[in-house]
Amino acid sequence: MGIDVAENTGEIYSNLAPREKLLAYGSVSLTDAELLAIFLRTGTRGLPVLRMAEFLLKEFGSLYHLLSADYDTFCSHKGMGLAKYAQLQAIAELAKRFFSSQFMHEDIMSSPSVTQEYLQNLLSGRDREIFVVLFLNNQNRVICHEEMFKGTINKVEVHPREIVRSAIKVNASSVILAHNHPSGHAEPSLADKIVTDKVIDACNLVGVKVLDHLVIGRQCCVSFAERGWI
């Protein structure tokens, strides 16, 4: 009849409520817990699915930390097993591919907001600094991107020669740099400016242009290009 049969009638209603809300008012009307409940589908005895979703978000602290948890950590929580772990890992990977597909076939210089949104979703919420490089062809389309350097909570060591080597390997004409600030504040530091200049100098030697450096905070990002620093 088009409706999944569940053992617990009360559980059906707790599961359907977020779906009905989504269909009536759109996905943006749902809380993180309600969206998560739709994917989890069922709770456990004494723990309806929506309460389970709320509990998981509280325990892990954020959607990012929940979706990036390893198997042992995830399954250490009541009611969490292989099936739900696989479901959430599939969700996380689909989200990554969705955002990636949005800008892989566009001239990203004509749609910078798409790039910023992608990088915001990729890096915001990470608990240590990650330095990402987007490699572009001569039509400003993304060839690939790479998380090149991983650091600590407040610094990451960047090697310009490694960026140049990767750019040559994929025949990139230009690059966009990006890294996050786990503190949540996107304002670039003096060290950020210095390393950007070093990468620009190294790339100039082989004819690769640095188009921008984006610093990602919790809710916003700062563009070096928009500030006239590149």
Swiss-Prot record:
A motif (JAMM motif) lies at residues 179-192. CDD domains: MPN_DUF2466. GO terms for molecular function: metal ion binding; metallopeptidase activity. Zn(2+) binds at H179, H181, D192. InterPro entries: MPN, RadC_JAB, RuvA_2-like, UPF0758, UPF0758_CS, UPF0758_N, UPF0758_YicR. HAMAP family: UPF0758_YicR. PANTHER family: DNA REPAIR PROTEIN RADC, UPF0758 PROTEIN YEES-RELATED. This is UPF0758 protein plu4865. It comes from Photorhabdus laumondii subsp. laumondii (strain DSM 15139 / CIP 105565 / TT01). The lineage of its organism: Bacteria, Pseudomonadati, Pseudomonadota, Gammaproteobacteria, Enterobacterales.
